[in-house]
Amino acid sequence: MAPYHIRKYQESDRKSVVGLLSGGMAEHAPATFRRLLKLPRTLILLLGGALALLLVSGSWILALVFSLSLLPALWFLAKKPWTRYVDIALRTDMSDITKSYLSECGSCFWVAESEEKVVGTVGALPVDDPTLREKRLQLFHLSVDNEHRGQGIAKALVRTVLQFARDQGYSEVVLDTSNIQLSAMGLYQSLGFKKTGQSFFHVWARLVDLHTVHFIYHLPSAQAGRL
């Protein structure tokens, strides 16, 4: 197991960071596709459509071809929420990481580096909502390279955000993940995050029953000590 350290983002990291974001999101497409295939409406479309065609045409081959021809479209639907997420990120906060995360003292972006390679990322931005009673920080873009998982890097990155939040005087840390990302949800819950609800990120997510799951971590007082 190669050693790693966590440091603030530098502009020279951009290509690696964007690669981790894109690759990490693409990894979830197969699980989304499998979930999509199990949905009742998908089964009705695949099986019901094939059966109707069989009854009309009397051809098993034609019915089978019909079902198989739908699979590429379903795969496209399964990938779309993730590519959409990356596209939005690269047009918004990730378009200029330094400006978005490192221009103010209440936000930051970190990378985990191992053997001079960026193998993990996480960012944190203040939640701009005047109706909130507590000062809240939001965690973004937690990602770890597939070859470096199982080393505690993700947990260390989350703890870095939590300690930053404490140091900056935040009362709460929030984050969003998806119902597909079971290991991520397990990680957050093991660190003390509590689920607060779920929603749909976009119409594409609704089509494949991909829920955004919301979590919150209530920070203890600064006197309670470091994490």
Curated annotation (Swiss-Prot):
Changing R149A: Exhibits reduced protein-lysine N6-acetyltransferase activity. The chain crosses the membrane at residues 43-63. Its main location: endoplasmic reticulum. Acetylation on Lys-99 modulates enzymatic activity. Signal peptide: none annotated. Residues 64-227 are lumenal. Residues 61-214 form the N-acetyltransferase domain. Changing K99 to E/R: Diminishes protein-lysine N6-acetyltransferase activity. InterPro entries: Acyl_CoA_acyltransferase (IPR016181), GNAT_dom (IPR000182), NAT_camello-type (IPR050769). Allosterically regulated by acetylation at residue Lys-99. The modification N6-acetyllysine is found at K99. SUPFAM superfamilies: Acyl-CoA N-acyltransferases (Nat). It is an enzyme of class 2 (transferase). It is a single-pass type II membrane protein. GO terms for molecular function: L-lysine N-acetyltransferase activity, acting on acetyl phosphate as donor; N-acetyltransferase activity; protein-lysine-acetyltransferase activity. It comes from the Eukaryota. Residues 1-42 are cytoplasmic. The keyword Disulfide bond does not apply. It is found in: Endoplasmic reticulum-Golgi intermediate compartment membrane; Endoplasmic reticulum membrane. The keyword Protein biosynthesis does not apply. Endoplasmic reticulum (ER)-membrane-bound lysine N-acetyltransferase catalyzing the N6-acetylation of lysine residues in the lumen of the ER in various proteins, including PROM1 and BACE1, using acetyl-CoA as acetyl donor. Thereby, may regulate apoptosis through the acetylation and the regulation of the expression of PROM1. Acetylates and stabilizes BACE1 immature protein, leading to increased steady-state levels in neurons. By acting on BACE1 expression, may regulate amyloid beta-peptide formation. N(6)-lysine acetylation in ER maintains protein homeostasis and regulates reticulophagy. Belongs to the NAT8 family. This is N-acetyltransferase 8B.
